[in-house]
Amino acid sequence: MPVTIIAEAGVNHNGSLEMAKEMARVAKECGADIVKYQTAVPELVVSKFAEKAEYQKQTTDAAESQLEMIRKLHFSFEAHKELKEYCDSIGIQYLSAPFDVPSVKFLSTMGLPLLKIPSGEITNLPYLEVMAAQKTPVLLPTGMSTLDEITDALGVLDDGGCPEVTILHCNTQY
């Protein structure tokens, strides 16, 4: 299997579609095969009562909530479609990690050849069942996981009919 280079864009575009496109362009110029973003419905993954981490308070508006900050960083589904079209036009594969079930289902409508499970979702077995049901190959990061958690996740994906799982060994420090 050839090496595949994935450029991690995440939400580092700060909610700017133009910056996200620029990140894709630069990733392509640097030789990346794939550029990966994040897709989420913020209200489904962040509590309105969640506080920001101290470093976030120091580097962003300390008065806004975690949810308000996350809302600014995530694109609408329509913006993700535009971003994928841009990636296609410059010859780099678009990839996104969906953080909730509606985002999984949305990305599945885009005809992507691959989905990435977010690192923190490896123990969310109902979420993994939905991912498997999409019948799309997935990337499974394991940086925060025990061997038993990885085994359980692989079992759910296999039982659900996921056609291919690529395990990513990640050194993670969140």
State each model region's role.
Residues 22-40, 110-111:
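Catalytic domains of carbohydrate-active enzymes, especially glycoside hydrolases
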Residues 147-174:
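Catalytic alpha/beta core domains of metabolic enzymes, predominantly
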